[in-house]
Amino acid sequence: MKKKLMFAAVLLSAAMLFGCSADKKDGQETTAAVKTESTKAEEKTEEKTEEAKDSAGDAVKANKPYKLALITMDSIDQHWVTLNEGAQAEAKADGVEVKFMSPDTKDDSKQIECVNNAVAGGVDGIMIAANGPDAISSSLKEAKEKGIKIVYVDSPANVEAEASFATNNKAGGKTAGGEMKKALEAQGITKGDIGIISTNASTQSTVDRESGFREAFEGSDFKVLETQYCDGDAAKAQTIAENYITKGVVGIFGGNEGSTVGIGNAIKASGDNKIVGVGFDKSDTIKSLIKDGYLLCTMAQNPDVMGKKGVDALVECLNGKELNGEVVDTGVSVLNKENIQ
């Protein structure tokens, strides 16, 4: 699937802060294909996702030993660790170097510092998951002006890139909403308040998930409350979820790994197994919460595929190939108690 990404650059002056780290160890995570409400749409998306996963293993040999940087939103979430693992494996196969230069927390100024450090270090290309698409755009524009190639993984900024590899987040959010709605109706619950916890109001990937989730409840008697933000911190998410539970919500949706963990822990602490918790992303903690019945399910992405294909895309464009801003959906699947590994 190819289309042009045309963005307006937003100029920003940012303070240089500490916290950018490099060369961290990785975890392991793989997932399958998108599940949507329509069987026909599901089959099409699964086909595209399998194609993406299959092609991710085809190494692209570099003409030179290029230096690449991988900059994610933080260096802690298992999602980013797994994305880095995929990137490192493909870098070895392609004959290039990838430095994992990500902040220790989800912080725009620290991510800007990472971009500036990568540029100063003489990298040929940058793979980035933008924490704040507006905030990071000025630094990315400056990097492009110096001839550095940009590829987006997971979450784009507002600067035109060579290619983007990410989940169809709105579709994934809508699937999450559909799963919650079905579970509530199975309990005989057809109305009530539903909470949403997400990382922040600016990250496009999580904003799209929230939008899709809300869409799933349109026309129903459920009321989806105003989103609360935790900056990706599981402890903050748990406090927010506990407040939601005190107010009598029937379900809570988490837009990322930290939010999802916090929701599961809050439901566990409440002792109320009727509250339906649904999340996004996959980690060992999230899987345990699903197995133990504190979360219904999570939308599991393919971060390893994002990392592998991101490296290949940078190598291809540095070798001279035009990618024309292609956008590739790397897929998402519903992980629940029945299919969890």
Task: Label every model-predicted segment.
Residues P133-A171, Q187, S283-L296:
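Flexible loop/hinge segments that line or gate small-molecule binding clefts
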Residues A91-P103, D193-S198, R214-A234:
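Short beta-strand elements in bilobed, periplasmic/extracellular small-molecule ligand-binding domains
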Residues N116-E145, F213, C230-L289:
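Hydrophobic alpha-helical
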Residues F7, L17-A41:
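Bacterial lipoprotein signal-peptidase II cleavage site
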Residues Y66-G86, E90-D94, K99-N117, V123, ...:
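Extracytoplasmic "Venus flytrap"
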Residues D54-K64, D193, I197-A201, S205, ...:
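Hinge/cleft segment of the Venus flytrap/periplasmic-binding protein
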Residues H79-D94, G172-E179, Q204-F222, G262, ...:
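Short, solvent-exposed amphipathic alpha-helices that sit
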Residues K61-N63, Q111, F165-K191, A235-Q238, ...:
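Hydrophobic alpha-helical segments within soluble ligand-binding/sensing domains
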